[in-house]
Amino acid sequence: MAFEDAALERALRAETKHGLTLCGGVSELTVIGCGWMAVIPEIELRDRLRGTLGALVEMLGYIPGMETVQIVRSKGAFVVNTVLPEVVGEEIAGYIVEEDEEEIRPTGLRLGLNFLMQKRNGEIVGVVPRGANLDVRRYAITPGGIVRQEDGDTGERLYRRGYRPREDTDSEATLRKWRHLEAMSWCDWDAPEE
């Protein structure tokens, strides 16, 4: 799985507010942001002096190696803390272990920063796409709410479901509006995928 370079660079710059975790490996670098993960092959890191590598070097001041670090912005500067790989292992596993997926498609509707997507069963979820290309039509969602976007040109992108009303915290009016949205079919499931 890989991000298109410019999209990942934008995501890296945007996510420093929440913090990033970088896990260096022998032949790849895993980058975890707020609700997304990307795996960048080492060859891409070494070959591209701008884009992804440039964004990381700008934040860190060096090329990440065989280490696991968290980057957060503090008082206008980036602070880098070394962490144990085991600390982030569970989060990485959450992205790559889930295999049961359902097809999901964009509805063309938005709710704040969330793009609304609908499963075949009618359930609608709000997703915050981080640097995603919404023209792509092949999406799947795992039980844990990880949405996968597949595109032959840019590889696979992963990002977590952003918003769905909850019975215990949201108002009845919000839940009623959401149920109304789910009662309608926003996607042409019989249309061939592009």
Sequence positions of predicted segments:
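C-terminal functional regions that serve as terminal interaction/effector modules
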Residues: 26-27, 32-194
